């Protein structure tokens, strides 16, 4: 039985305003995505579109469009950069599902369950190739540098997570380094390229990157909590997947650090040795409840969310700025 964490749900916790402001540009991004997934190798569009059309929020490409708008950009390079960001994200999901042996993604069977691990990995590689082609076509070496560096950092973060898997001695700082790489870096890059292609001052580029980095950390911390305290129907994946896969996330780090000897022995048995019995997930949630690790993880997410909002202070009041502030609130209050 999962514990439902009482998230704040303010009326401003919505991405609707952002969706409305970037709707016309997102139509162009989606058309670009559809075009660039085309291939004479029929399995490629089948696998790619299975995931791309499965109902994701498209938050990362919308952030690219939003930051370009906030920076007053008047060209069309942001369209291909936003599509590149979405392809990078989709590729990481295809690869992650293979590494994690995931059965579900966004409430549907994962691509690896339908086409196999090999196809998932190779189509992910195809999407990365298409992403880099579009970056080059935009003609901004700085934007290319930001996104290509992000691709390397994401891979480093994934390897760091792999190395930390099943290691209950992982510290909070070590875990935060993992999520900065594997999750927050793409948020940061997606936000930074907008003012870069608009040739805005370095201070604005840095501020936009800070918005993305802090939002990405907050987003992942909430995700970690939802794996133990969410609802499967909304999440589109099974509750407790992280636990069953031996993933060390912040709620686990805190529970292990605060636990007594017998509690630590439970975590070592379940996560390091993979010896999980019926009822162990409920016991894990019970320990997290005892030590308030889910609530404290959410508290940390709010800290990073506040820093994301603070980074927006550099920009004058506008509908786009307000919409971005609402996106931060949404990421903190979300249930999926």
Please identify what each model-predicted range represents.
Residues 1-336:
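All-alpha prenyltransferase/terpene-synthase fold signal
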């Amino acid at each position: 039985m999962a514990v439902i964490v009482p998230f704040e749900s303010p009326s401003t916790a919505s991405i609707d305003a952002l969706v409305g402001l970037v709707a016309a540009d997102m139509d162009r991004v989606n058309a670009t995505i559809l075009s660039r997934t085309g291939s004479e190798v029929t399995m490629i569009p089948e696998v790619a579109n299975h995931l791309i059309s499965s109902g994701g929020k498209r938050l990362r490409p919308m952030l690219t469009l939003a930051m370009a708008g906030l920076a007053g950009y008047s060209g069309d390079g942001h369209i291909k950069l936003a599509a590149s960001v979405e392809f990078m994200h989709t590729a990481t999901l295809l690869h992650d599902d293979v590494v994690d042996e995931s059965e579900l993604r966004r409430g549907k069977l994962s691509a690896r369950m339908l086409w196999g691990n090999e196809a998932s990995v190779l189509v992910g590689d195809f999407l990365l190739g298409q992403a880099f082609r579009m970056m080059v076509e935009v003609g901004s070496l700085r934007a290319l540098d930001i996104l290509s560096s992000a691709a390397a950092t994401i891979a480093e973060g994934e390897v760091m997570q792999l190395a930390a898997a099943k290691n209950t001695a992982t510290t909070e700082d070590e875990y935060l380094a993992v999520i900065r790489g594997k999750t927050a870096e793409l948020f940061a890059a997606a936000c930074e390229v907008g003012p870069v292609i608009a040739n805005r001052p370095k201070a604005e580029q840095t501020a936009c990157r800070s918005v993305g980095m802090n939002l990405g950390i907050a987003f992942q911390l909430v995700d970690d909590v939802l794996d133990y305290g969410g609802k499967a129907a909304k999440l589109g994946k099974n509750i407790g997947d992280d636990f069953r896969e031996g993933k060390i996330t912040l709620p686990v780090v805190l529970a292990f650090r605060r636990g007594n000897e017998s509690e630590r022995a439970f975590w070592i048995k379940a996560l390091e040795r993979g010896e999980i019995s019926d009822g162990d997930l409920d016991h894990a949630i019970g320990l997290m409840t005892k030590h308030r690790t889910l609530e404290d993880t959410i508290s940390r997410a709010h800290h990073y969310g506040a820093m994301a909002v603070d980074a927006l202070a550099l920009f004058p009041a506008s509908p786009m700025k307000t919409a971005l502030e609402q996106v931060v609130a949404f990421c903190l209050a979300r249930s999926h």
